[in-house]
Design a protein with these regions (language model features):
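N-terminal leader/targeting and pre-domain segments
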Residues: 2-25, 81-114, 200-206
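Local sequence-structure signature of Cys/Sec-based thiol-disulfide redox active-site neighborhoods
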Residues: 5-48, 111-147, 152, 248
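Structural micro-motif
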Residues: 25, 62-77, 160-177
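Thiol-based oxidoreductase modules, predominantly thioredoxin-like and allied folds used
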Residues: 33, 53-64, 146-161
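Non-catalytic, surface beta->alpha helical segment in thiol-disulfide oxidoreductase systems
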Residues: 72-101, 170, 175-208
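Structural detector for internal amphipathic alpha-helices that build alpha-solenoid repeat scaffolds
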Residues: 207-226, 247-261, 273
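Alpha-helix N-cap/helix-start positions at coil->helix boundaries
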Residues: 214, 228, 241-244, 276-278
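Amphipathic alpha-helical scaffolding segments comprising HEAT/armadillo-like alpha-solenoid repeats
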Residues: 227-239, 261-275
Length: 278
């Protein structure tokens, strides 16, 4: 496990200068756990928050042994200590967040607007990687532009188990929904192509949970009607431990039955089998 030293004087001064350009105050949420690294995460954020009155650090402590995280917003978090090369994209992300803007191309923003289900993007990085800051900066902006992208930046020198889990051989590596991988210095167009061209029929059940829990049955039913497919991942929500998720999926099926009775009839055998096992 690598040990991160406190920010250098030069890094702190650079951060102070960058944070002076913030237009609106913002919060950095640091989720601390019993993990041995939690103390380092706090020591990293404290001087940054002290460097600007526009940055408020909120520390939340959990009893679990889960990894600590630095959360810039609900869909963008770091399992990393972004010093050194990674400091620039981290600070730039805070600046863009404060301005509610990005530097993404208009065509990118238009395509991101078509995302309607959550997509998990894990970015594997290391402190010595020359291309990682560029990719991290791009992915962070995509997360600022679309709440449906759930981004986690992971330093594999701190969390080697993720490198083992995904058989990472080089960085940066992007892992999309725990399956597809993109390696190297990826262009904006290529990454957006990958993110926006996925078929909902292949999505994990968790990808549909956000829609169901937000009560947007009409949206999910409309997607199924448009694709003439009752997504298997969505149907699995009928057995979710969360009662509200199960009920939400029932509402989706009711909405779907009104729009396309034939489509609902096509999954009757699955529903009967499901009820038999309950």
């Amino acid at each position: 496990m690598r040990t991160m030293t406190v920010l250098t004087y030069q890094e702190l001064e650079s951060a102070r200068s960058a944070l002076e350009t913030l237009q609106n105050p913002g919060v950095i949420k640091v989720n601390l756990t019993r993990d041995d690294l939690a103390k380092q995460f706090r020591q990293f954020i404290e001087p940054l928050a002290s460097a600007s009155s526009m940055v408020q650090a909120i520390y939340t402590t959990y009893l679990e042994d889960d990894p600590p995280t630095i959360e810039i917003r609900s869909n963008l978090r770091y399992m990393a200590l972004p010093g050194g090369r990674e400091m620039a994209p981290f600070l730039q992300t805070l600046i863009y967040r404060s301005r509610s803007e990005t530097s993404l191309a208009e065509r990118t923003l238009s395509r991101l607007a078509t995302l309607i289900t959550p997509t998990q993007v894990e970015v594997m990085v290391s402190p010595t990687c020359p291309h990682c800051p560029i990719v991290v900066g791009l992915v962070n902006q995509l997360a600022l532009a679309s709440i449906y992208l759930e981004v986690t930046i992971i330093d594999i020198t701190l969390f080697a188990d993720f490198a083992e889990k995904y058989s990472i051989r080089a960085v940066p590596t992007l892992v999309i929904d725990g399956q597809d991988q993109l390696v190297g210095n990826i262009s904006e167009d290529l990454l957006v192509d990958k993110l926006t061209n996925q078929s909902p029929a292949t999505f994990h059940p968790d990808s549909f949970k956000k829609i169901v829990k937000e009560g947007d049955a009409e949206k999910l039913a409309g997607m199924m009607v448009a694709d003439a497919d009752v997504y298997g991942g969505a149907l699995q929500l009928l057995t979710d431990p969360d009662w509200s998720v199960r009920m939400g999926m029932m509402v989706v099926l009711e909405e779907l039955a009104e729009r396309s009775p034939v489509l609902v009839q096509s999954v009757y055998p699955y529903l009967v089998e499901l009820l038999d096992h309950e």
